[in-house]
Amino acid sequence: MPPKAHAWVGPSSIARVLACPPSARFSEQFPDTESDFAAEGTEAHELCEYLVRKALGEKVRNPKKKLKFYNAEMQECAEGYAAYIMELYETAKQNCTTTEIMLEQRVDVSEYIPECFGTADCIIVADGTMTISDYKHGMGIKVEATDNPQLKTYALGTLAMFDFLYDINTVRLIIYQPRLENVDEW
């Protein structure tokens, strides 16, 4: 997992800021607290990252022992995500030998939005196509990829990082939300 850092405004809060711009500065006065639901989601992301890195052949440490919220459902969700990401990656590699995959990648968008950065769950870049996938562990609200401000913000930053290396003409945005059986692509 990347170091815990928070932007003044990040991709995960961009929808709120677009709807109410003053909320960006207003929210600074409140402590940055994490609910149990958010902590569970963070741990699910750690497990997802571990399983994808393991599938890629990287030497990684299994995080299960330190996960407070780990259970069979989290394992099943993370395994499904890892299989899905590996399928996307293998398909991209068939079309481009220089395909890049990045997990928990810091994306800087400050060229367009001051002090804006965030961490994208998975970015796959191949000639012609860039795919950004976001894992959602929550089951309270179904998240859609279509016109998703968070994913579009990651796309903006990722294009700035890779457009000079790859001739990107297609951007795929994907939400993977297994507990609601939701895999949505735009």
What positions do the PLM features span?
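Glycine- and charge-rich intrinsically disordered segments
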Residues: 1-3
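Nuclease catalytic cores
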Residues: 6-56
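Broad hydrophobic/π-residue packing in well-ordered secondary structure
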Residues: 17-18, 22-25, 51, 85-88, ...
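Residue-level detector of alpha-helix boundaries and kinks
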Residues: 29-33, 70, 139
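A non-catalytic, helix-rich entry segment at domain boundaries
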Residues: 34-35, 39, 43-105, 110
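Mg2+/Mn2+-dependent nuclease catalytic core
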Residues: 97-186
